[in-house]
Regions:
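Intrinsic-disorder/low-complexity detector
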Residues: 1-133
Length: 133
């Protein structure tokens, strides 16, 4: 199944946010040569149970990773921030603030968003490590 970029389901959108956050963390860790799990991966179960509260925690933690990626000349960070913004704009305010557990649909959004990373694009967007998107 391909990523549905205009699908507005709360669970699907939260899954997409988690995938983008994980991507930012992964690439920041790769730049510094760190070999550990991302916060997004470690907090996935908590995220499924309390998405609004856990997203706030993850988003605050992203700042230090984004600082590491500032030195990247590829536009990777700008693209990820834009992606986060586009996903956040699709939320209904009440859905975004709803801390009820997510259904399995969040995993669909998560994996479809992650798969987008490996799809072939004709753009020149690359990761900080030079990997083509």
């Amino acid at each position: 199944m391909a990523l549905e970029e205009n699908y507005h389901s709360r669970d699907y959108l939260y899954g997409r946010l988690l995938a983008v956050a994980e991507r930012i963390e992964e690439d920041a860790l790769n730049i510094t040569g760190e070999k550990r799990s991302t916060n997004a991966a470690r907090l996935m179960q908590r995220f499924a149970d309390q998405p609004a509260k856990t997203w706030l925690t993850l988003y605050k933690a992203l700042d230090s990773y984004m600082q590491r990626l500032q030195v990247s000349p590829t536009g990777f960070l700008h693209s990820r921030k834009k992606e986060l913004g586009e996903i956040l704009e699709m939320f209904d305010r009440e859905d975004y603030n709803n801390n009820a557990p997510l259904s399995g649909e969040f995993l669909l959004g998560y994996y479809c968003q992650r798969q987008k990373r490996y799809a072939k694009f004709t753009t020149t967007d690359t990761t900080p490590t030079g990997e083509a998107e």
